[in-house]
Amino acid sequence: MSRKFLLVGNSHLACVKVAMDIEPGLLGGRTVDYVAFNQIDAADFDVVEGIIKPPTNTSAIPADARLGEARATDYSGFVIVGMGLSINLLASIYLSHRLLAHHRQGLHLLSRAAFDSAVAESIQKLGVNSIIAKLRAATNVPVLLVPEPLMNAEIAKDERGADVWTGEHTPFLVERYISSLHQVFDPVVDLLEQPPETIDGVFTRAEYAYGGLRSLTKRDKRGNPWRYKEDHRDYRHMNEQYGAIICRRIENWLTSRGL
């Protein structure tokens, strides 16, 4: 079997791809294909008679991140990046509901059992589960899941997010997020936790978000990767420095798997 790998993702794949464009030796020089599309289209990803069929919404797929007639068995492993696996799944619950220990006036009270059930359901509803199932039905090679990074630390300074992203409940949300990912995905795929050197408390270190990337192909007027300015209020997307760290962790995973 050839040593070729497919990276599947949404906008969070951009920092990884740009890092590899800058430093081609990342992943140990292994051959890599990419396919990118919006997470809302993930349920349309399919494998038909062994051929990988990305969503047909081509406007969501950058020109250099489309596949031709690629067979699932052409690849020695798959890496799935982002695709809605985010701490925001839990934060969205805490916008209106809280456990008793974190409760305040104006919010609905939620039991621990109901909270855990809501978290598990929100993860299981994501289209990434369909991608995994369809790849697994076509091949048994290893699959690595790379969730979205924690929020940029600068979000704690933004009054719009202060209620959810500051307070004694925030470490609890992060702990439950990570443990819930393991509970759902450990039986079926490998999971890459966020590298600790990129974490500042319960957030991603702000330095990795400056100039965050969302597009695999979009360029500025100088031909450089298009990125957000440092003061842009997108707290979820990271830059190529973060992408390079993730690439090295992916390479470690590939090596540990003998790939």
Report each predicted region and the residues it spans.
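Conserved aromatic-histidine-acidic binding/catalytic patches
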Residues: 4, 8, 116-123, 165, ...
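Alpha-helical cap/lid subdomain in secreted, periplasmic
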Residues: 71-208, 222-224
